[in-house]
Design a protein with these regions (language model features):
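Penicillin-recognizing serine hydrolase domain
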Residues: 1-8, 14, 21, 78-293
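A short glycine/serine-rich beta->alpha loop
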Residues: 26-32, 105-109
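Amphipathic coiled-coil signal-relay and dimerization helices
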Residues: 19-27
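Acidic/His-rich structured neighborhood in mature extracellular/periplasmic domains
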Residues: 35, 58, 102-104
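Short alpha-helical patches at coil-to-helix transitions and adjacent helical residues
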Residues: 37-40, 66, 70, 112-120
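Active-site SXXK
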Residues: 31-53, 64, 262
Length: 293
């Protein structure tokens, strides 16, 4: 990893040994702010708290999980008691590295703290212990993750761009500014191909940094363009992991019969660009997968 970049990963092979084992790991218990990865926990909590799902809520779950919709996440977060949902999920699933946002930031679901180890544990819970309707609903949506988020940001980085199908993914990003340098188009993403050329766009989820963006540099072609959320710049020392640094995460399942469970979490230098961060995490994910084969 380049200087100033922090990475953590866990890869669990469900076919290794008798009942599966971790086959690649680094900084497994290091805490990161979750960004949109926390939406999986929101979905688990919601589905396990009721036996029927009204059509309107089914639409919220679909758009939140497939297209990382922030308004849907905020609706479910508020209904579930904000940080209380994280406390419930951490206890129920045995997530020792997971904690809700600070009490001073109750609405910021993206400021939840979690680790690569705990993310893998959540996926294993869905695969092995969750009720079939919970498992099938959540993983069904993650298998159908859209190239573009509802806000126009490209979410095909890491696993979708580095690994062949089949896969199921939930991505997370925060601290890169609010306006994408290039608006995502459904036909522009190339799943299964590592790309280090022109960059897809990136975003700050509304739940993790709702304030305006601070940009440096110019928007001219070929010029260096960097942006970081104003909230992140002001919030150093707040107790939220890596505030002041952009984070980019790729998590999910890969391979036939969901053989591999992966979580790759990264924090990048303050002011770092989306394109450079995407190249780093996608290259890292491709290298991890190559070493498994």
């Amino acid at each position: 990893m380049p200087a100033g970049t922090t990475a953590a990963w866990v890869v669990f092979d469900r076919q290794a040994g008798g009942g599966g084992r971790i086959v690649a790991t680094r900084n497994a218990h290091r805490a990161f702010r979750s960004a949109s990865v926390v939406k999986i926990l929101l979905a688990v909590d919601y589905l396990e708290s009721r036996t029927t799902v009204p059509p309107a809520d089914a639409r919220l779950l679909k758009i939140m999980l497939r297209s990382s919709d922030d308004d849907a996440a905020s609706t479910l977060w508020d209904r579930a008691g904000k940080g209380a949902v994280i406390t419930r999920m951490a206890r129920r699933l045995g997530l020792s590295d997971t904690a809700p946002p600070p009490a001073s930031k109750p609405g910021f679901w993206g400021y939840t703290s979690l680790s690569a180890y705990d993310v893998v544990r959540v996926y294993r819970y869905l695969l092995d212990r969750a009720a079939p309707r919970v498992r099938d609903t959540i993983l069904g949506h993650l298998r159908a993750a859209t190239p573009c988020g509802t806000d126009g940001f490209d979410q095909y980085f890491g696993i979708p761009r580095a690994l062949p199908r089949p896969w199921a993914v939930k991505q997370g990003w925060s601290g890169f500014g609010e306006v994408p340098p290039v608006r995502c188009r459904p036909g522009s993403a190339s799943p299964g191909v590592v790309s280090t050329g022109s960059a897809p766009a990136g975003a700050v989820p509304a739940g993790s940094a709702p304030a305006g963006a601070v940009s440096t540099g110019t928007g001219a072609t070929g010029a260096r363009r960097a942006s970081i959320s104003a909230v992140a710049l002001r919030a150093r020392g707040s107790g939220v992991p890596d505030l002041g640094r952009p984070v980019l995460h790729t998590t999910g399942l890969a391979g036939k019969d969901d053989r591999y469970v992966l979580a790759v979490l990264t924090a990048h230098p303050a002011g770092g660009t989306w394109s450079a961060s995407v190249r780093r995490i996608t290259t890292l994910t491709a290298e991890l997968y190559r070493d498994l084969r």
